[in-house]
């Protein structure tokens, strides 16, 4: 079951301060942020069946609880960003640790080899 925090996409960029993948308490940072910033936490639960797809805004606080089953939990993730997206110059923590290996050393532009253009809107 996927968990989304309702309205959290409006809270702005909030990079995780600690461990991003498989932390001991996956809601710790959410609870700390909400308390510090007087935000209400309202969780919406979304059951994504095998073969199903879920989409969400990149700022949305999301996650899932522990997998207590004997089965592995598998997922494929695709991050879709606008064609003019750039690496954030001040985002050094959280997921930046994961994605910094895709950054060009001489630019904040996304590298086409890792972030290919999927569609173009011809207005």
What function would you assign to each model-found segment?
Residues 17, 53-55, 59-123:
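Non-heme Fe(II)/2-oxoglutarate
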Residues 1-61:
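Double-stranded beta-helix
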């Amino acid at each position: 079951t996927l968990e989304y925090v309702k309205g959290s996409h409006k809270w702005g960029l909030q990079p995780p301060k600690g461990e991003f993948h498989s932390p001991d308490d996956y809601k710790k940072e959410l609870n700390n942020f909400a308390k510090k910033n007087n935000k209400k936490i309202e969780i919406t639960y979304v059951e994504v069946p095998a073969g199903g797809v879920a989409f969400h805004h990149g700022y949305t606080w999301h996650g899932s609880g522990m997998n207590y089953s004997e089965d592995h939990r598998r997922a494929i993730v695709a991050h879709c960003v606008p064609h003019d997206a750039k690496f954030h110059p001040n985002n050094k923590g959280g997921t930046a640790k994961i994605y910094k290996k895709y950054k060009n050393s001489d630019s904040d532009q996304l590298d086409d080899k890792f972030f290919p253009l999927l569609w173009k809107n011809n207005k």
